[in-house]
Each structure stands twice: as C-alpha cells, then as structure tokens.
Regions:
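Short pre-catalytic strand/loop immediately N-terminal to key active-site residues, enriched for Gly-Thr
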Residues: 80, 127-134
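Catalytic nucleophile loop of clan PA
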Residues: 23, 132-153
Length: 178
C-alpha cells in the first residue's frame, strides 16, 4: 500500500468548534466528511499536510447518514485519486486502514481488521473495526489494501477498546452522485 497517496488526499477540517478529517474525491472535486464534524457551519477550513489552509463551503449535508460534502477554494488537480470501492466486499478479518487527524494531531494511519462488515446500530449498518479510532478521525476514510475507500470513520465506543465504526461505502455512493 502506497501511503503517500493517502497522505496527500486526506485533509484536516477545522472551525471554531473543533476539528476532524476529510478526504478528497478527485472525480467529484469535493471533500467528504461527517455531518457531525461540520454541523452548524456553512464554511470551514481544510488543511493539507503542509498545513496550508483552504476555505471550504459545506455544499451538501445529510444528517441522517452523517455525511457532508465540501467544496474548497483551490486547485487540487495534482492530488492522487481516491476511489470509492465499487461495492461492499468487506469480510470479517479483512485488513483495513483508518486515516485522519486524531485529536487534531498530525496525520496518522492505523491498521486493523474488519470485526463486522455490517454491524447494526440505531437502525443503520456500520463497518466495525479494531483499528484505532479517536476523536478527530471522524470524516476520514477507511481504506482497503487497494487504497479504495470502503467507509468513512464515524465513531468509537469510548468505554471499550478497539471498537471503531465507519459508514459503509454504499451509503456514500448516493450523496456524491447528487
């Protein structure tokens, strides 16, 4: 896995209320994050790994799915493509990677396995992984070995170790096709 492509395409989201993560989808010229990361804000800043800030408008939100799309000012054409996995091919035990900015710190990638590809919580299905997930990772991608986005990091159980969750990729296909 070539981590440099991930490193270049995952950004930090900041606003006066905190921070999270997002990732760039070149085919759509949009950044994807969680709704709860940008809730209450119409504009935010996205920062690359050189800490360059770019103003981004929140252009689409779906609170029920916890997805938000951001349009940032700037030329991102040189960034590598991060593709959405064509379908949900995750199985228990498959290796996944969680990329983002935990606690607002510099970029990290953690590795883990799929604990459950379809964990039902609150009437929705999520990816459950044992990869390290912390506040600030929200909105960042969950990737497979082929560097395809298989999910969007959303939360962890604070009272348990190694229980991170992500929005499944098929949930993401509809909003970005909008």
């Amino acid at each position: 896995m070539e981590h440099n492509n991930i490193y270049r395409s995952v950004f930090k989201v900041t606003h006066s209320g905190g921070s999270g993560s997002c990732f760039y989808l070149k085919n759509y010229d949009l950044f994807v994050t969680n709704y709860h990361v940008v809730e209450g804000y119409r504009t935010v800043a996205v920062h690359d790994n050189d800490r360059n800030p770019y103003l981004a408008k929140v252009v689409l939100v779906n609170p029920a799915l916890d997805i938000a799309l951001l349009a940032a000012e700037g030329d991102f054409s040189a960034l590598p493509e991060m593709t959405l996995a064509a379908d949900d091919s995750l199985t228990i035990g498959r290796k996944v990677y969680v990329a983002g900015y935990p606690y607002g710190m510099p970029f990290t990638i953690t590795e883990g396995s799929v604990s459950s590809p379809k964990q039902l919580m609150d009437g929705k299905y999520y990816i459950q992984t044992d990869a390290a997930v912390n506040p600030g990772n929200s909105g960042g991608p969950i990737l497979n070995d082929a560097e395809e986005v298989v999910g969007v990091t959303v939360s962890k159980f604070t009272q348990a170790d190694n229980m991170g969750f992500g929005i499944r990729v098929e949930t993401l296909h509809a909003p970005v096709s909008y």
